[in-house]
């Protein structure tokens, strides 16, 4: 595994692709103080189990921050050049923003504007949802479109981009 880039890193993949595990290994190998920003909400028992599984897998040595909406705010609060921050995941953040009827363009612009200011190393995890069929309902299509746009703008600003499938990372940029 290579050393962690100074610029943002984006790790994309499908559900259960191994993207979170790969990202955690990348962060753990960095030698920086590890922070984890969880954007998911425990809406039900199944989601609580997923969150618990991720927390158990990470083990000790991580400081966890739960922030479903104010991603830039939490990143600013924990920004330090000795930190590496794993944000898992952007697609759950998009879901939360949509459910709260936030201005997606403004939220995405705020995140992208923050990236050059960040002193901590940032590793973003996100689900690639644009590889399947066109969703049949409007909300699902809007979600797919928002996620796709966010991935493109974060990838453009990232030093490294990976796509993970079957637990195997493919380096796409950097």
From Swiss-Prot:
Is Kinase set as a keyword in this record?
Answer: yes
Q: Where is the active site?
A: 54
InterPro entries cross-referenced by the UniProt entry:
CobU/CobP, P-loop_NTPase
Which of this chain's residues are annotated to bind GTP?
13-20, 38-40, 55-58, 66, 88
Give the GO molecular function terms. Answer: adenosylcobinamide kinase activity; ATP binding; cobinamide phosphate guanylyltransferase activity; GTP binding
Q: In which pathway does it act?
A: Cofactor biosynthesis; adenosylcobalamin biosynthesis; adenosylcobalamin from cob(II)yrinate a,c-diamide: step 5/7; Cofactor biosynthesis; adenosylcobalamin biosynthesis; adenosylcobalamin from cob(II)yrinate a,c-diamide: step 6/7
Q: Which GO terms describe its biological process?
A: cobalamin biosynthetic process
EC number(s) reported in the record: 2.7.1.156, 2.7.7.62
Q: Where are the membrane-spanning stretches?
A: none
Alphabetized UniProt keyword annotations: ATP-binding, Cobalamin biosynthesis, GTP-binding, Kinase, Nucleotide-binding, Transferase
CDD domains, sorted: CobU
Q: Which reaction does it catalyse?
A: adenosylcob(III)inamide + GTP = adenosylcob(III)inamide phosphate + GDP + H(+); adenosylcob(III)inamide + ATP = adenosylcob(III)inamide phosphate + ADP + H(+); adenosylcob(III)inamide phosphate + GTP + H(+) = adenosylcob(III)inamide-GDP + diphosphate
Q: How does it assemble?
A: Homodimer.
Say which family it is in.
Belongs to the CobU/CobP family.
What function does this protein fulfil? Catalyzes ATP-dependent phosphorylation of adenosylcobinamide and addition of GMP to adenosylcobinamide phosphate.
State what protein this is by name: Bifunctional adenosylcobalamin biosynthesis protein CobP
**Gene name linked to the record:** cobP
């Amino acid at each position: 595994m290579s050393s962690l880039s100074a610029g943002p890193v984006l790790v994309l993949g499908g559900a259960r692709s191994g993207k979170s595990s790969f990202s955690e290994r990348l962060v753990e190998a960095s030698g920086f103080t590890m922070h984890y920003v969880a954007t998911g909400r425990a809406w039900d028992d199944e989601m609580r189990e997923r969150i618990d599984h991720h927390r158990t897998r990470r083990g000790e040595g991580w400081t966890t921050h739960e922030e479903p909406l104010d991603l830039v705010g939490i990143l600013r609060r924990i920004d330090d050049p000795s930190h590496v921050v794993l944000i898992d995941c952007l697609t759950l953040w998009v879901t939360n923003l949509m459910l709260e009827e936030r201005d997606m363009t403004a939220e995405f612009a705020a995140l992208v504007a923050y990236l050059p200011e960040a002193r901590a190393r940032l590793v973003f995890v996100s689900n690639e949802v644009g590889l399947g069929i066109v969703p049949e309902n409007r909300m699902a299509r809007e979600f797919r479109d928002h996620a796709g746009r966010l991935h493109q703008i974060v990838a453009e600003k990232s030093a490294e981009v990976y796509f993970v499938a079957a637990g195997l990372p493919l380096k796409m940029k950097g």
